[in-house]
Amino acid sequence: MLFLHFLFLDVVLGGSITENVVQENISFYVMQISSYANKSWVQNHGSGWLDELQTHGWDSESDKIIFLHTWSRGNFSNEELEDLQLLFHAYFSGLALRIQHQPSQLEVKYPFEVQARAGCELHSGEHTKGFIHAAVNGLNFLSYQNKSLVPSPEGGTRAQKFCDLFNTYEGIRETVYYLIRDTCPRFLLGLLDAGKMDLQRQVRPEVWLSSSPNLEPGRLLLACHVSGFYPKPIWVMWMRGAQEQLETKQGDILPHADGTWYLRVTLDVAAREAAGLSCRVRHSSLRDQDIILYWGHGLSVILITFAVIVPLVLLIVLMLLYKKRCTYQGIQ
């Protein structure tokens, strides 16, 4: 819900967008996926995210940050960004060396994959909270509390040994603390300020209905398609009058190449009960004007159009044939 966060961002930065502060949280975080095939081979993937919007990538060949938007630099200077770039490079390299040189101490068993997420969350402009979460092969491994790494129960002795090793390096602990408590919040606010024109945009959804036969005879699977909307938060429900149909099933919200979103919401219903159903869509771009499509109305319009146009076309064809015949007889 990025567009809502600007309501309190303006207050934090001393702007004048609104006098009301919306109680919303927003986070910026970096994600890491490192695959270790053996002692000599590792592949790193890195990315940066503003809530659910990817803002940065990581080129593992050149060890450089990829800025995915014109505003992805926030308000940081080139020097600050270069320092962060060097820091990420040192982190990836140092982690790989540590794992390769101390396999027995860390109980390393190849192959394995490390997934990590580190960043900060801004709570309505009041305070920030830093976080680090890491998993190995999909199982929780460690988290961050009070300037220290804390092992997760699922991580076992491996997690305990890794955290004990990390926590002995006071300089690294202070650097991590500074990054998530100072650097990250400043960068987050800079992103929101630099990208507000793009992040605040509102794109109305297009909505249409369809159906497909169900495996069970006499039933239909009704689908409400909502496409091309931005921002991502949206509410879609099958309705009968003012009554929400609790059997409504929502699919995943999928991205389009242009940054907008697509959603499909379905309802399994007896064919004889389909009449009177409608799909209702609420989105910030619509303000208070919900989109409501009634099942069967579109079909009725098509049938009416078909019933009017087809006889008209046939009549025109018959008139042309009759005229042609009369002309031919006149020549004879």
UniProtKB/Swiss-Prot annotation:
List the InterPro entries hit by this protein, alphabetically: Ig-like_dom, Ig-like_dom_sf, Ig-like_fold, Ig_C1-set, MHC_class-I_related, MHC_I-like_Ag-recog, MHC_I-like_Ag-recog_sf, MHC_I/II-like_Ag-recog
Per UniProt, the keywords (alphabetical) are: Adaptive immunity, Cell membrane, Disulfide bond, Endosome, Glycoprotein, Immunity, Immunoglobulin domain, Membrane, Signal, Transmembrane, Transmembrane helix
| Main localisation | membrane
Q: Which residues are glycosylated?
A: N25, N38, N75, N146
Membrane topology listed for this record: Single-pass type I membrane protein
Source organism (scientific name):
Cavia porcellus (Guinea pig)
Q: Which cysteines are joined by disulfide bonds?
A: C120-C184, C224-C279
The transmembrane residues are: 301-321
Looking up CDD domains in the UniProt record yields: IgC1_CD1
Which superkingdom does the taxonomy of this entry point to? Eukaryota
Report what the protein is called. T-cell surface glycoprotein CD1c1
User: PROSITE patterns recorded for this chain?
Assistant: IG_LIKE
Annotated signal peptide: 1-17
GO BP term (any one): positive regulation of T cell mediated cytotoxicity
Which residue ranges are assigned to the Extracellular compartment in the record's topology?
Answer: 18-300
Q: Which residues lie on this side of the membrane: Cytoplasmic?
A: 322-332
What taxonomic classification does the UniProt entry list for its organism? Answer: Eukaryota, Metazoa, Chordata, Craniata, Vertebrata
| Localization in the cell | Cell membrane; Endosome membrane
Q: What else is known?
A: During protein synthesis and maturation, CD1 family members bind endogenous lipids that are replaced by lipid or glycolipid antigens when the proteins are internalized and pass through endosomes or lysosomes, before trafficking back to the cell surface.
Q: Assembly and interactions? A: Heterodimer with B2M (beta-2-microglobulin).
Q: Where is the Ig-like domain?
A: 205-292
Q: GO CC terms for this protein?
A: endosome membrane; external side of plasma membrane; extracellular space
